[in-house]
């Protein structure tokens, strides 16, 4: 799990509860037990591709089941997926966000892994209301991301083939 995420959650007063991992993703029985037992669960946090520290990738079947559990227990999913562009072998597994029918999945990706580690810039896909709240929170905390790196990233995406760069 990304330590930056855990520190952010703790700073905001969250009580983080771990769920054991299996080679194909979260232990779904343990996840459902936690969803049933815990009060006021706000979201499921999951790194679906090359989970840290195990390196496991959540299977598509388990992604569907995680989404179904989130619907059943009416919780959001934070899919932290900074590595999904970096698969060089094996079968591509679409992000959990691709299953999202009701604005329940917040997808976070990273440009640091695919453009330059020093850039430390990411992107998000979520429902409009959540993106607007996130933007307001970001502006209140540090005004904005480095404009120069935003412009460099935008220009790169406009001019070059990202898939060829990663391959």
Mark where each language-model region is.
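Short beta-strand->loop structural element characteristic of the AMP-binding/adenylate-forming
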Residues: 13-23
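Active-site phosphate-binding strand-loop segment of PLP-dependent enzymes
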Residues: 24-87
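Substrate-binding/gating loop at the entrance of the active-site cleft, primarily
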Residues: 1-14
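Helix C-cap/helix->beta junction micro-motif
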Residues: 12, 72-73, 103
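Conserved core segment of the aminotransferase class I/II
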Residues: 101-167
